[in-house]
């Protein structure tokens, strides 16, 4: 039976890694598939945090050379590196402020399947709207983002605190609305994810460190590795995809998933 739980942890790790950076809400998928396979982890919230950490570390690994060059450039006085680093910080801070003020409300009130389903569907409609508009893409390179554009993306990320919205979806769409090309918005979303998700993961791990035991470490470790590997596969593929295609396919998928979660919540006792 314990081996079966490890397999479930492996599966959910892959689900997290595959969905974290697609604009389709990893939270919605974890709720749905966790219910379907009846996964129970003694680590609870920590399991989710650690597999999210696995996904974001995959991005750090893929962009490691850019990160190293950015750090070197920042401290050597390179104007472009400093501009981009400050842009990421500008986009990051709204989430810090809102997160600190609203974290308890979000987890106690908004974290429910119904909210997730509604957010999925509303988010899909916003994607359709943004893709239907011919916004002037003034920025094709993520490193050339302006401070104003960065702030708009940061505010969009705050909306993603509503479970089911999708952090990547909100920041990519927010970037496009602000004047970034689809590819530039996607790449900036990845860079913004690093401080955002690493910060959130660190906060949650410290807060819930007491639930980490030898009994759940295997499940957590397996989920972490699975999420890391799956995210490696997704990130590069997504950048190539958005260069050639719109986000409409993800919008349709969100609607289908939202309807499924609504039905499951109303008739099959689906819970977060």
UniProtKB/Swiss-Prot annotation:
Membrane topology designation: Multi-pass membrane protein
The keyword Transmembrane helix belongs to this UniProt entry's keyword annotation: yes
EC number assigned by the record: 3.6.1.27
GO cellular component, one term: plasma membrane
Organism field: Acinetobacter baumannii (strain ATCC 17978 / DSM 105126 / CIP 53.77 / LMG 1025 / NCDC KC755 / 5377)
A Pfam family of this chain: BacA
Main localization, broad class: membrane
Domain of life: Bacteria
Protein name: Undecaprenyl-diphosphatase
NCBIfam families: PRK00281.1-2, PRK00281.1-4, undec_PP_bacA
Cellular compartments annotated: Cell inner membrane
Family: Belongs to the UppP family.
Reactions accelerated catalytically: di-trans,octa-cis-undecaprenyl diphosphate + H2O = di-trans,octa-cis-undecaprenyl phosphate + phosphate + H(+)
Signal peptide: none
TM ranges: 4-24, 43-63, 86-106, 109-129, 145-165, 186-206, 222-242, 249-269
UniProt keyword terms in alphabetical order: Antibiotic resistance, Cell inner membrane, Cell membrane, Cell shape, Cell wall biogenesis/degradation, Hydrolase, Membrane, Peptidoglycan synthesis, Transmembrane, Transmembrane helix
Enzyme class: hydrolase
Protein purpose: Catalyzes the dephosphorylation of undecaprenyl diphosphate (UPP). Confers resistance to bacitracin.
GO biological process, one term: regulation of cell shape
GO MF terms, alphabetically ordered: undecaprenyl-diphosphatase activity
HAMAP family found in the cross-reference section: Undec_diphosphatase
């Amino acid at each position: 039976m314990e081996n079966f739980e490890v397999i479930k942890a492996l599966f959910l790790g892959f689900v997290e890694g595959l969905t974290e950076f697609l604009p389709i809400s990893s939270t919605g998928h974890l709720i749905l598939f966790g219910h379907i396979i009846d996964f129970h982890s003694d680590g609870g919230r920590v399991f989710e945090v650690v597999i999210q950490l696995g996904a974001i570390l995959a991005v750090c690994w893929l962009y490691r050379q850019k990160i190293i060059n950015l750090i070197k450039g920042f401290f050597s006085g390179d104007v472009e590196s400093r501009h981009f680093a400050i842009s990421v910080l500008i986009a990051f801070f709204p989430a810090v402020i809102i997160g600190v003020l609203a974290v308890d409300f979000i987890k106690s009130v908004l974290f429910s399947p119904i909210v997730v389903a509604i957010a999925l569907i509303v988010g899909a409609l916003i994607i359709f709207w943004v893709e239907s508009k011919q916004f002037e893409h003034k920025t094709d390179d993520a490193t050339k983002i302006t401070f104003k554009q960065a702030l708009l993306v940061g505010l969009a990320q705050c909306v993603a605190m509503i479970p089911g919205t999708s952090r990547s979806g909100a920041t990519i769409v927010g970037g496009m609305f602000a004047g970034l090309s689809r590819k530039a918005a996607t790449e900036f979303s990845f860079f913004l994810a690093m401080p955002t998700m690493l910060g959130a993961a660190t906060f949650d791990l410290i807060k819930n460190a007491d639930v980490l035991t030898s009994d759940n470490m295997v499940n957590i470790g397996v989920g972490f590795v699975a999420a890391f590997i799956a995210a490696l596969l997704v990130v590069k593929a997504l950048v190539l995809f958005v260069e050639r295609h719109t986000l409409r396919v993800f919008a349709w998928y969100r609607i289908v998933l939202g309807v499924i979660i609504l039905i499951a919540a109303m008739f099959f006792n689906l819970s977060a």
